């Protein structure tokens, strides 16, 4: 569990990865489907914004009971990608200015250390960063170093009891896979694009 003490570092890495995946996002892409069933890119970006709001509220107020958009850095107009940049910067600033990593933070009916909240946020932002990159047509792999730290932690935070409503069931991979693909699969995504049909259409 030593990596939990690196919560802010992991959150920073996750945010950088997600924002890089969102960089190609334009208004023309907002209605594109994502790996999240029934969600287009606009809905996914709104969800990530809400999640950042909850994390920001937890870090600054010591508790979070509902989705709340944080007062992050300003962004120009209604561009959801620019909004995400501003909110992510505000969240990282708030985490850096907050108290000890061991302090207790309440999120809904759970009480976690601040560092565990940051790691939980890193997992969610990482997987949604992957979702965003797929929707934008890039399918950026999760950085190996980030995946190596998050992969053994994820099953401790995402259990059979906490998974429903948050993540789909793990996807079984047919063979050897990178750490990033293993993480994405554990979080209910198919990390590899469907195989192209053969000459006979199969």
Task: List where the protein language model places each region.
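Extended, alpha-helix-rich binding/interface surfaces that flank or overlap catalytic cores
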Residues: 44
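Glycine-rich loop at the start of a catalytic domain that most often binds anionic cofactors/ligands
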Residues: 47-48
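Structured surface interface patches that mediate subunit assembly and partner/cofactor docking
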Residues: 1-10, 14-17, 24-37, 57-202
């Amino acid at each position: 569990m030593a990596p939990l003490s690196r919560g802010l570092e992991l959150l920073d890495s996750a945010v950088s990865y997600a924002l890089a995946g969102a960089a190609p996002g334009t208004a023309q892409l907002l209605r594109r489907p994502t790996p999240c069933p029934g969600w287009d890119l606009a809905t996914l970006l709104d969800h990530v914004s809400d999640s950042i709001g909850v994390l920001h509220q937890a870090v600054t107020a010591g508790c979070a009971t509902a989705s709340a958009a944080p007062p992050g850095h300003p962004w120009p107009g209604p561009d959801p990608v620019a909004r995400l940049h501003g909110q992510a910067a505000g969240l990282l600033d708030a985490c850096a200015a907050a108290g000890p990593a061991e302090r207790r933070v309440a999120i809904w009916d759970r009480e976690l250390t601040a560092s565990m909240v940051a790691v939980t946020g890193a997992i969610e932002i990482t997987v949604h960063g992957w979702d965003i990159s797929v929707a934008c047509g890039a399918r950026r792999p999760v950085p190996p170093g980030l995946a190596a730290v998050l992969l053994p932690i994820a099953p401790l935070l995402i259990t059979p009891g906490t998974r429903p409503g948050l993540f789909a069931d793990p996807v079984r991979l047919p063979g050897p896979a990178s750490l990033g693909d293993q993480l994405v699969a554990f979080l209910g995504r198919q990390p590899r694009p469907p195989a192209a049909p053969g000459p006979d259409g199969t």
